[in-house]
Amino acid sequence: MLLSDRDITAELDAGRVALDPYDPGMLQPASIDVRIDRFFRLFDNHKYPYIDPAEDQPELTRLIESKPGEPFILHPGEFVLGSTFELVTLPDDVAARLEGKSSLGRLGLLTHSTAGFIDPGFSGHVTLELSNVATLPIKLWPGMKIGQLCFFRLSSPAKKPYGSGEYASRYQGQRGPTASRSHLNFVHTDVTVTDAGQQGE
């Protein structure tokens, strides 16, 4: 069930859902706006010949911080990681989804590539996967509205919420834009087995 503004306010007032800092003026009819922080993670494409999700590639990205009062310039075709200014904490029976802002989408800014879902139990700054699909550079001002969080109540509390220890929970407590940790639970699956259970020729 998608939570309304009344439900979101009730969850925040009860301390079950937390946004830090919280600005009541960011509340929308069925979501709450979030802002972009001053940290960005850039890709150093010359460090590796390719990106391999099965390997640890610690030099693939580097962290930068925008200077006070200055925007970060996202060039056409560029992909960088950012993060929400707000720290988001969810209980074990509420999940969330990050959506972009319509006004920014109309300028060619994509807020996330695929990872818009936030598990129940998560706590941390939400990493943004920012892309510029326009033909001109886009200025990203730290503190500007960058997206909106929608909240969903689960049919029952999660048996093993994010961060419970049952899962890797690789991004629990993350601060700032966090690089991929896909190598930590990468699994090579044998796909030569056919649907009938026979080895492929």
UniProtKB/Swiss-Prot annotation:
Record site feature (Important for bifunctional activity), residues: G116, F117
InterPro entries per UniProt: dCTP_deaminase, dUTPase-like_sf, dUTPase_trimeric
CDD domains per UniProt: trimeric_dUTPase
Domain of life: Bacteria
Disulfide bonding pattern of the chain: none
Keyword annotations from UniProtKB, A to Z: Hydrolase, Nucleotide metabolism, Nucleotide-binding
Record's catalysed reaction(s): dCTP + 2 H2O = dUMP + NH4(+) + diphosphate
Active site: residue positions: E129 (proton donor/acceptor)
Pathway the protein acts in: Pyrimidine metabolism; dUMP biosynthesis; dUMP from dCTP: step 1/1
Principal EC category: hydrolase
Hydrolase is among the record's keywords: yes
Keyword Nucleotide-binding in annotation: yes
MF GO annotations: dCTP deaminase (dUMP-forming) activity; dCTP deaminase activity; nucleotide binding
A Pfam family recorded for this sequence: DCD
GO biological processes: dUMP biosynthetic process; dUTP biosynthetic process; nucleobase-containing small molecule interconversion
Enzyme Commission number(s): 3.5.4.30
Function: Bifunctional enzyme that catalyzes both the deamination of dCTP to dUTP and the hydrolysis of dUTP to dUMP without releasing the toxic dUTP intermediate.
Summary of subunit composition and partner proteins: Homotrimer.
Family: Belongs to the dCTP deaminase family.
Protein name: dCTP deaminase, dUMP-forming
Natural source organism: Clavibacter michiganensis subsp. michiganensis (strain NCPPB 382)
Gene: dcd
